[in-house]
Regions:
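Short beta->alpha linker loops
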Residues: 7, 31-35, 59, 74-78, ...
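Asp-based phosphoryl-transfer active-site loop
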Residues: 1-6
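Conserved phosphoryl-transfer catalytic core
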Residues: 8-29
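Asp-based, Mg2+/Mn2+-dependent phosphohydrolase catalytic module
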Residues: 84-87, 100-187
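A short, Lys/Arg-enriched amphipathic alpha-helix followed by its capping loop at the start of a domain
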Residues: 14-19, 81-91
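Helix-loop "lid/cap" segments that line or gate small-molecule binding pockets
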Residues: 15-16, 35-50, 107, 139-140
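Metal-dependent phosphoesterase signature
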Residues: 22-27, 42-81, 89
Length: 187
């Protein structure tokens, strides 16, 4: 729904430069659709003891908070058109995001699309986040629908894996990450 990835690329380039490890924006592709704990793990694997994890997190959120204090969340083209269509035809709509609840709700409100959603599921609301299917299964349960009757729009590998494993019909939304031939055949 949102192009938050481009903001994180800038943030992690800034953080990496400040901490002396060099631009780290490339890590966004490696962590797309993953919750904070998995993202931290990926950073540990990549950089080991080269930087303080708490400092990376603090600086990242400082950069992100400053960005959003001065800019609206970037909305992907066509989002409101799709949401208007779905609501106009009385579809029930859920968000299933790996991001924390406070971040998701702030972005939905900032983009003035919070009113479209019947259910909001976030990475900090489930025991296992994407690529595990839990978030989609829980969203479908709250919508009172079997996952086989739900469509999932995804732009990350971990999100696609989660949606497919849950039994949702899955639609790939091209973004920074591009699926390989095996993943393309599944969606």
């Amino acid at each position: 729904m949102f192009d938050t990835e481009s903001v994180f690329v800038k943030a992690w380039d800034y953080v990496g430069d400040r901490l002396g490890i060099g631009p780290a924006g490339f890590m966004v592709i490696e962590t797309l659709g993953m919750n904070l704990e998995v993202t931290k793990q990926k950073w540990r694997e990549r950089f080991g003891g080269k930087c303080d994890e708490a400092e990376v997190e603090r600086m990242t959120y400082e950069y992100i908070d400053d960005y959003y204090a001065n800019n609206h969340v970037p909305v992907k083209k066509g989002l409101k058109t799709i949401l208007d269509y779905l609501k106009g035809h009385r579809y029930r709509i859920a968000v299933a995001s790996s991001s924390p609840e406070n971040v998701v709700k702030a972005h939905l409100k900032d983009a003035d699309i919070d009113k479209y959603f019947d259910v909001i599921m976030c990475g900090d609301m489930v025991a296992k986040s994407k690529p595990e299917p839990d978030i989609y299964i829980e969203a479908a349960t709250k919508l009172k629908l079997p996952t086989s009757e739900c469509y999932a729009f995804e732009d990350s590998e971990s999100g696609l894996k989660a949606a497919l494993a849950s039994g949702c019909r899955t639609i790939m939304v091209p973004d920074l990450w591009q699926p390989d031939d095996v993943m393309r055949q599944k969606v």
